[in-house]
Amino acid sequence: MSHESVWNSRPRTYGKGSRSCRVCTHSAGLIRKYGLNICRQCFREKANDIGFTKHR
């Protein structure tokens, strides 16, 4: 069995491997709250555009 035939050999329908950022398709550091599905790096860039404000 070659590497190509083993890679993605099963469908990813649940778990961390099935989800990715809707902006950059990165899968780590994903913010899923409120249905955002954005990685934390993209969230920091787009937070003001989405409507989030920083409280201090």
Curated annotation (Swiss-Prot):
<dbReference type="GO" id="GO:0022627">
    <property type="term" value="C:cytosolic small ribosomal subunit"/>
</dbReference>
<comment type="function">
    <text>Component of the ribosome, a large ribonucleoprotein complex responsible for the synthesis of proteins in the cell. The small ribosomal subunit (SSU) binds messenger RNAs (mRNAs) and translates the encoded message by selecting cognate aminoacyl-transfer RNA (tRNA) molecules. The large subunit (LSU) contains the ribosomal catalytic site termed the peptidyl transferase center (PTC), which catalyzes the formation of peptide bonds, thereby polymerizing the amino acids delivered by tRNAs into a polypeptide chain.</text>
</comment>
<dbReference type="GO" id="GO:0008270">
    <property type="term" value="F:zinc ion binding"/>
</dbReference>
<dbReference type="InterPro" id="IPR043140">
    <property type="entry name" value="Ribosomal_uS14_sf"/>
</dbReference>
<dbReference type="GO" id="GO:0002181">
    <property type="term" value="P:cytoplasmic translation"/>
</dbReference>
<keyword id="KW-0689">Ribosomal protein</keyword>
<dbReference type="GO" id="GO:0003735">
    <property type="term" value="F:structural constituent of ribosome"/>
</dbReference>
<feature type="binding site">
    <location>
        <position position="42"/>
    </location>
    <ligand>
        <name>Zn(2+)</name>
    </ligand>
</feature>
<feature type="binding site">
    <location>
        <position position="24"/>
    </location>
    <ligand>
        <name>Zn(2+)</name>
    </ligand>
</feature>
<keyword id="KW-0479">Metal-binding</keyword>
<dbReference type="InterPro" id="IPR039744">
    <property type="entry name" value="RIbosomal_uS14_euk_arc"/>
</dbReference>
<dbReference type="InterPro" id="IPR001209">
    <property type="entry name" value="Ribosomal_uS14"/>
</dbReference>
<dbReference type="Pfam" id="PF00253">
    <property type="entry name" value="Ribosomal_S14"/>
</dbReference>
<keyword id="KW-0963">Cytoplasm</keyword>
<protein>
    <recommendedName>
        <fullName>Small ribosomal subunit protein uS14</fullName>
    </recommendedName>
</protein>
<keyword id="KW-0687">Ribonucleoprotein</keyword>
<feature type="binding site">
    <location>
        <position position="39"/>
    </location>
    <ligand>
        <name>Zn(2+)</name>
    </ligand>
</feature>
<dbReference type="InterPro" id="IPR018271">
    <property type="entry name" value="Ribosomal_uS14_CS"/>
</dbReference>
<comment type="similarity">
    <text>Belongs to the universal ribosomal protein uS14 family.</text>
</comment>
<comment type="subunit">
    <text>Component of the small ribosomal subunit (SSU). Mature N.crassa ribosomes consist of a small (40S) and a large (60S) subunit. The 40S small subunit contains 1 molecule of ribosomal RNA (18S rRNA) and at least 32 different proteins. The large 60S subunit contains 3 rRNA molecules (26S, 5.8S and 5S rRNA) and at least 42 different proteins.</text>
</comment>
<keyword id="KW-0862">Zinc</keyword>
<feature type="binding site">
    <location>
        <position position="21"/>
    </location>
    <ligand>
        <name>Zn(2+)</name>
    </ligand>
</feature>
